Amino acid sequence: AYRTEGALKATKVIWSEANAEIASSGLYFPQAGFPYIKINHIEVSNGKLYASAMHTGDVTIGNVQWKGIYMNIFDFMYDDLISAGIFSLDVSALDNAESVAQIGVKTQLGGDQMGVEGINFTTEGNSIYLCFAAKGTLTFTYQNGSEDITLAFDNTNGMVEHAFITTAIQDGKATTKIFHADSHDNGASYNSIGKMQIEGNTLYIGGTFHQMMPFDNKLTHVGGCDLFVTALDKNSLEAQWTAQSGLDEGNGDTQHFNENFTSMAVNNGEVSLYGYVLQDENEKTFTKS
């Protein structure tokens, strides 16, 4: 953190490391760059710095500990499963860490490739609104409780549900709504939450989706995946409307073409989405409003 004149104010180091028992098992062969923690969004509200992150391995944030979850592959090897969370720090000195929310696969050393695919959040006063994309059976833990989230998962036939879960956290209590979609057998994680923003009584969420749109099951992606924006009532979390880009960028499975979310802006109820597509290594930028 820096002061307004540019002087360094405080530094906070956050790290992830493999669970000691897993690391010494002789069955753990991490991929390059694993374990990790990747912060994707930060906001300041009421004297606190909030951050959302995806992680593998055990994460240490001051006194906060997020445990890594691992997959047992036929008792032959252990692999990292992706978890996510939101934490806060006092903005003045980046201390007094608190875990606001943490999401991870429910079963440690289970045999299925489950996990979190994306997370984001926004704040309003003392309220925190978050949304995450996920698959499988997960445990969602917040300050005053926890709940299990069970999504359709047929590992035998490869049919997996990729859902969006939206939550409002107020005074440590969570109100959660799951937006379901039909299962499919494409393992690629094209569902993402790129940005969230509140204007008036509306919570806007932008990102990408693949196959059936969880916020509006009448919509289906075109090409590899689609940009989307959805408007929710911030009090009930009910969906009001959802729009998609509808750009046919090519087949994301065979040609590796897919839309990538970069930003979203909301002004008096008008929403603009920004993203790009990489085709034959040539970047093509497009805008939808």
Cite the ranges covered by each PLM segment.
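A sequence-level/structural motif corresponding to short, flexible coil/turn segments enriched
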Residues: 1-289
